[in-house]
Amino acid sequence: DIYGSGMSETVFGDAFASDPSLHREDVLIQSKCGIRQGCYDLSKEHILESVDGILKRLQTDYLDLLLLHRPDALVEPEEVAAAFDVLFESGKVRHFGVSNHKPMQIALLQKYVRQPLVVNQVQFSIPVSNLVANGMEVNMETPGSVDHDGSLLDYCRLHDITLQAWSPFQMPSWKGCFLGSDEYPELNQKIRVLAEKYGVSDTTIAAAWILRHPANMQLVTGTASEKRLKEIIAACNITLTREEWYELYLAAVSYTHLRAHETAANL
């Protein structure tokens, strides 16, 4: 409910309502709540008010999935549970999840919430890959060995929580898209080779890298280009080999580690 101050949902709702060929039961609609100007807010009152606003803007009676956008340091799990009960029993929300939450934060919520938390949406791309790096670089003195997120990937797989990857084409530190960027020449060269091999675009290969992971992740991305959307969808039909997956990972992580060492040396 913060994107464009809700305008994104208004535009989507208007577009959906204007096309009689679209049927609500054929579309899965997901939204988030929990951020207000200047603070995070997972209180019962804010969650309920947010969902009512979301439904009004989307011109629909229910959400298929509601996510708690970010952890609220002042969260009272009992309030979240009470809000979820109201939303579920009223039919306004069918499924629930979180975004950018660590395992213990999820476990704390799930202790009180009766409905299963089925999604955790986190940042993940080839260059932003700590989600998998800390699992491979165990007992190493490398940047990737630092577990910032408490074995998040393993926890979600153990508890049947679907991971959604946001900003799947993003570089670290919000520097923009890595595809075609001079920041990652080796990675982009290897992506182009694979794109030619499979007869697809660079975008398709970058998306296929995420989908190749056995956690069965989902991509969360936005575009104003129908062509690019089709390129992303095409990734569902590409299965990179194990060697190709690691080749792309190493091309990105070697650059990221180099930057980290340079930064540390300059401190």
What are these regions (language model features)?
Residues D1-V11, R36-D41, D72-E76, P103-M104, ...:
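Acidic-and-aromatic substrate-binding clefts and catalytic sites of carbohydrate-active enzymes
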Residues T256-T263:
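Conserved small/polar residues in nucleotide/adenosyl-binding loops
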Residues L58-L74:
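Active-site groove signature of glycoside hydrolases
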Residues E25-Q37, V122-I126:
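A short, structured active-site edge motif that brings together acidic residues
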Residues A15-R24, L55-L58, Q110-V113:
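Acidic (Asp/Glu)-rich catalytic clusters
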Residues D1-V27, E89, P172:
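N-terminal binding-site loop/beta-alpha segment at the start of enzyme catalytic domains
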Residues S43-R57:
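Short, acidic/polar
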Residues P71, V75-A251:
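Beta/alpha (TIM)-barrel catalytic core signal, keyed to glycine-rich beta->alpha loops juxtaposed to Asp/Glu
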